[in-house]
Every structure is written in structure tokens, then in C-alpha cells.
């Protein structure tokens, strides 16, 4: 009869063996090949969640620890993290880690070279690379049902871009529609192909919390499947993450803050475009690529399990679709293809969300032209009236003046730092203001 060999990390008599914590910690790290980066365990398969680690520890030590297994597992996990601490690695842009190995670039810079060798990584895609995977017919039909053909090219390239840990495109994809088209199914499919540990599913509003940034550390994709109509009170974090090339301070609950270099990309689905309450800058607008889903065909019958069926049967084919998009993007030097229709829609939506630009383009109470002048306070009163009439949220005074200088530049409007006199129906007043624009007294009188 074969004799049972006790674990190396135990000691004592056969009937009363005990746990050697120091040896167990070392053996756990060795067996699971884990490293601790910013208090998170990672293995060659990517993120190694604390819950999974504690369950493995409890299963191991249960025969050798009489009580308080949860507390003991918590203590051991803390020691494991301390012992296998490592500095964050530089994101790898020359390889992709898939379930069955590693993809690297060929002589043309395309991800076509496959090896079954696995390396330590922060982001492993939980789908096998199979160059002979059949065409994902369900997935392609879903795309045809929901998106225009030329928009599918943009989608393929942007979604493929999410495989790489980089923010080089400096764009967030905002997909909008009237509701019921099935646009957010794409988010569920991407979450399944990229992997739960590589995606963060939440509302963008979470980024306004002090601990919001820490949630996207080492994530490939942020998915908001129900974009709120409420504007962001502070858009700075969103802008920084979309274009990030440096380290950012991340606050975490109950642990020390640390510096992270996030590379998360954003895909948001909703009935509204993304708006910022106090940021109408070109930078905020430029970071958004706005795409509109096709209206739902009246006779289309939806399959409520389509995302599950695609992931169960076509995940390898969808991965090839993503790789094709990424490789095309690389060939185009990371210049994403955008249809004229979508580009025009993006520009239109951006203007609709820009109250200052709308004021300059649409307000009947102002004139724009050479030789005209207006005081800043008068312009702001006219702007407030325009926003009230059009149910827009006006900016604060200083923000309005800053945006007026920026938005008015192309229209010949210039701020003047020296006070000047103006004669109006209210009398003569001396104050600072702008050249190239004037306000009709009657417009203000009517609105008072």
C-alpha cells in the first residue's frame, strides 16, 4: 500500500502534523509563480484574486490548523504578498498573452508569430489563439444588425486596440442610440473575450470618487453600459486616463496610496453623449469618438442570450477579429479609420454639448465682426439668458470668459485686458471686455 507523503510545509508526527508557516509561504509563491504588485497578486495567467488565493490557502491548511482558518489564511496571504513584492513591470507592446501561449510581432510589426511558451504577465486574454478558428457568424450578424458597415471598421480597430496596454489613440469610444438596439451587448462580448480580470464594469461617475482611479489599475478596458445623462462634475480624471502617459496617484482604502501608470481604454454605451458640467474645452471633446448605433429594425427578433452564445461558440473567432483590427491599426500607424458620417455626427454632438459655441453660433442677441466691442459682464448676462432660453447649464463667469477666448479665436473675437468705454442705453460704462463681438441692448432688455 502506497504511503501518503505529507506536504513539505508541515512537521511533527504523522497523526499530529502542524503547519510550518514560513515554508508554506515560500512553497505557495513557488507553486503558483506569483508576484505582488501594488498589493495585488499576479501569476503567468494574469491577476490572481485575493479570494481565490485565500480559498487555496484554506484548502491546503485545513487538515493542519484546528480553528480560525479564515484568519490564518488572511495572515498567510499578507505574508505571501510581502515576500513576493515586485516593482510594476513596463507594459509590453511587442507581445500579447493569450490562454494557450504568446503572440509576438513578425518582421512587418504584425501579431502573427505564436508560441506555446507562457511568460509572467499582468493581462492574459482567457481565449486560445487559433488561426484556423471559423468565422464568428453569430457575432458578425450581430454587428450587421446594430452597426453600419463603415462603423464596423472603426469598431474593429478600436476593440483590437484594447488588446494592447497603451493609450496611444487618446480616444474614448462613446456609442449612443435611442435604446433597444443591442449596442451594449458588445460590452458583454468584449468583457468575455478580454477577461473579467482585465475589464472594469462601472459607471464613469465612479472616477469622481477619491478611490476611483485605483479601480482601473492594470485594466485593459473600462465598460460603462448605461452612460448617465448627468454631466461629470470633474472631467479631469477622465481626460487624464484617456491620454495617460505618466504615473497617477491612486488612493486605496485601508492601504497606502501608490503611483500607478494606467492604460485603461473606455467604451461607453448610452442614450446620451458624455458631458462635463464645467469643462467645455477642446481637450475634453477631442478625447471622445462618438458613434451612433443603427435604429432597430421593426421586424428584428432579439436573442436575449446572444452574448453568451457568441462567447461559448465563437470566442476564438472574435479574438481573430480583434487581432485583425489591431494589425490594421498598426499598419496605419495608429490612425483609426472613421467614416465621414460618424465624424460629422461627432462634431455635431460636440457642438450640442458646448453652450459657449452654441451661444456664438446661434444667439440672435449678439453680432460678430470687426470693429465691434462688448464688456465681459454684458456678454455673460447675454450668455446666461441664452442658456436659460435653451435649457442649458451655464458655466461660471471665469469659465465662460476662458472658453470665450478659446472658442472665439477662430471668429476673430479677442479679449482686451485694458478697460474701455462703451455707450449703451444704460449709460456709459468703463470695463474690460472683448473686441469682435457686441450685444444688442434689446436682447438683454427683453430677457430682464
Where do the model's predicted regions map?
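Short, small/acidic-rich helices and loops at N termini and domain boundaries
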Residues: 1-4, 40-68
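Feature primarily recognizes SF3-like P-loop helicase cores of small DNA viruses
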Residues: 1-37, 63-181, 185-448
Amino acid at each position: 500500500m502506497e504511503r501518503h507523503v505529507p506536504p513539505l510545509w508541515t512537521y511533527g508526527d504523522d497523526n499530529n502534523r502542524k503547519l510550518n508557516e514560513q515554508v508554506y509561504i515560500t512553497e505557495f509563491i513557488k507553486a503558483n509563480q506569483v508576484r505582488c504588485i501594488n498589493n495585488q497578486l499576479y501569476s503567468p495567467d494574469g491577476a490572481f484574486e485575493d479570494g481565490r488565493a485565500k480559498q487555496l490557502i484554506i484548502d491546503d491548511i485545513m487538515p493542519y490548523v484546528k480553528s480560525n482558518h479564515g484568519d490564518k489564511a488572511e495572515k498567510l496571504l499578507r505574508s505571501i504578498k510581502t515576500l513576493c513584492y515586485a516593482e510594476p513591470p513596463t507594459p509590453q507592446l511587442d507581445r500579447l498573452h493569450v490562454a494557450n501561449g504568446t503572440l509576438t510581432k513578425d518582421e512587418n510589426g504584425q501579431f502573427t508569430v505564436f508560441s506555446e511558451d507562457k511568460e509572467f504577465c499582468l493581462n492574459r486574454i482567457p481565449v486560445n489563439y487559433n488561426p484556423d478558428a471559423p468565422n464568428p457568424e453569430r457575432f458578425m450578424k450581430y454587428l450587421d444588425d446594430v452597426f453600419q458597415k463603415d462603423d464596423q471598421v472603426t469598431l474593429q480597430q478600436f476593440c483590437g486596440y484594447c488588446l494592447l496596454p497603451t493609450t496611444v489613440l487618446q480616444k474614448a469610444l462613446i456609442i449612443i442610440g435611442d435604446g433597444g438596439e443591442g449596442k451594449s451587448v458588445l460590452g458583454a462580448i468584449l468583457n468575455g473575450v478580454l477577461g473579467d480580470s482585465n475589464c472594469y464594469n462601472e459607471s464613469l461617475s465612479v472616477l469622481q470618487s477619491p478611490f476611483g482611479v485605483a479601480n482601473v489599475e492594470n485594466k485593459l478596458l473600462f465598460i460603462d453600459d448605461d452612460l448617465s445623462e448627468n454631466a461629470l462634475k470633474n472631467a479631469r480624471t477622465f481626460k487624464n486616463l484617456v491620454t495617460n502617459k505618466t504615473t497617477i496617484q491612486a488612493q486605496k482604502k485601508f492601504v497606502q496610496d501608490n503611483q500607478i501608470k494606467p492604460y485603461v481604454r473606455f467604451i461607453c454605451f448610452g442614450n446620451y453623449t458624455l458631458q462635463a458640467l464645467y469643462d467645455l474645452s477642446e481637450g475634453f471633446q477631442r478625447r471622445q469618438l462618438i458613434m451612433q448605433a443603427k435604429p432597430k429594425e421593426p421586424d428584428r427578433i432579439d436573442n436575449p442570450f446572444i452574448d453568451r452564445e457568441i462567447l461559448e461558440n465563437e470566442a476564438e473567432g472574435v479574438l481573430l477579429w480583434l487581432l485583425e483590427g489591431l494589425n490594421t491599426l498598426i499598419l496605419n500607424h495608429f490612425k483609426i479609420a472613421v467614416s465621414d458620417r460618424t465624424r460629422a455626427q461627432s462634431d455635431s454632438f460636440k457642438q450640442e454639448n458646448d453652450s459657449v459655441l452654441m451661444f456664438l453660433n446661434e444667439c440672435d442677441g449678439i453680432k460678430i465682426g470687426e470693429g465691434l466691442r462688448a464688456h465681459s459682464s454684458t456678454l455673460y448676462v447675454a450668455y446666461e439668458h441664452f442658456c436659460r432660453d435653451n435649457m442649458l447649464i451655464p458655466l461660471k463667469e471665469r469659465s465662460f470668459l476662458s472658453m470665450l477666448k478659446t472658442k472665439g479665436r477662430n471668429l476673430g473675437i479677442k479679449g482686451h485686458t485694458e478697460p474701455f468705454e462703451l455707450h449703451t442705453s444704460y449709460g456709459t460704462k468703463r470695463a474690460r471686455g472683448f473686441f469682435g463681438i457686441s450685444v444688442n441692448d434689446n436682447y438683454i432688455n427683453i430677457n430682464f
